[in-house]
């Protein structure tokens, strides 16, 4: 869940080479979510409560002895359960110096800011999707997003990523490798979703054996190149079929033409000369030409 969240809320064009911040955010989120998982009732195990816990965190750079309400919460848990995994992850976060810890809190808060919106909080308050059932019986799940606003597209990316992970667990642990009901993901306007590269390419290579299938629909090849840079050919190569419905983008035309290869052109020429010693000949030739 946390890896899914981090990957889908990290911009695809992000060039940060320092993993410290993401790992620090991950440690904090693990502490918060594990606390809710083990200590909170099911109705409080949601992103809204995670945001409340982040709001309860505070760091005073000039006072190392200051304890925020969140610090006290984990301190009490550690007194009851010294080996709590949630407390162990929280201690990792607390190793950061005051200024660094505050930066981590700000970074997590910005990453999860959308979950402060009432509509998003309500949407993620309870699990109404029951993703594990998609491979058990015939179900149609529609994820509709506006084409004029991309600010919340990552939510659909999270659903797809969580769906694939859930179905993998169902197939491997319950059905010994293959779902009883095949699941087909029709990813229309895939450029607006842009699933995390490493996770999705790995899944795309192995999902068919588990009766999970994806149709990746884009406007042109330029969209794939923009999303996956040097790995776009890997994504295309992992697809069994390639369907081209036409378009006006030059590079896509060129790519499809090269896929099709050359076609054989048969040419017949007729030559005739008139006069006292006139002649007539027919010449047949075959040549190769790129398919337009």
Model-derived features: where do they sit?
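Conserved residues at beta->alpha junctions
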Residues: 146, 218, 247
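Structural recognition of the conserved hydrophobic beta-strand(s) that form the central parallel beta-sheet
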Residues: 213-219
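P-loop NTPase motor core of the ASCE superfamily
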Residues: 12, 17-26, 31-34, 132, ...
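Active-site-proximal loop/turn and secondary-structure-junction residues that shape catalytic pockets
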Residues: 191, 220-222
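P-loop NTPase motor domains
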Residues: 1-212, 227, 237
């Amino acid at each position: 869940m946390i890896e899914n969240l981090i990957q889908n809320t990290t911009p695809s064009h992000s060039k940060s080479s320092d993993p410290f911040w993401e790992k620090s955010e991950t440690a904090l989120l693990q502490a918060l979510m594990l606390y809710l998982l083990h200590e909170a009732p099911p109705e409080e195990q949601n992103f809204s409560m995670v945001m409340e816990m982040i709001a309860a965190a505070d760091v005073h750079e000039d006072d190392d002895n200051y304890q925020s309400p969140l610090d006290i919460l984990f301190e009490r848990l550690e007194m009851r359960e010294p080996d709590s995994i949630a407390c162990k992850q929280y201690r990792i976060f607390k190793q950061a110096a005051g200024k660094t810890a505050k930066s981590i809190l700000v970074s997590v808060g910005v990453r999860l800011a959308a979950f402060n919106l009432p509509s998003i909080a309500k949407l993620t308050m309870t699990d109404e999707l029951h993703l594990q059932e998609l491979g058990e019986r015939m179900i149609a799940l529609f994820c509709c997003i506006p084409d004029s606003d991309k600010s919340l597209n990552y939510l659909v990316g999270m659903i797809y990523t969580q769906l694939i992970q859930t179905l993998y667990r169902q197939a491997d642990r319950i059905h010994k490798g293959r779902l009883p009901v095949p699941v087909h993901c029709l990813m229309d306007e895939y450029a607006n979703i842009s699933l995390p590269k490493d996770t999705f390419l790995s899944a795309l290579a192995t999902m068919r054996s588990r009766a999970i299938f994806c149709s990746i629909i884009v406007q042109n090849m330029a969209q794939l190149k923009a999303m996956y840079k040097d790995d776009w050919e890997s994504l295309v190569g992992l697809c069994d079929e390639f369907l081209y419905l036409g378009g006006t983008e030059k590079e896509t035309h060129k790519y499809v033409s090269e896929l099709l290869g050359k076609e054989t052109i048969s040419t017949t020429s007729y030559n005739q000369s008139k006069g006292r010693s006139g002649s007539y000949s027919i010449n047949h030739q075959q040549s190769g030409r790129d398919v337009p």
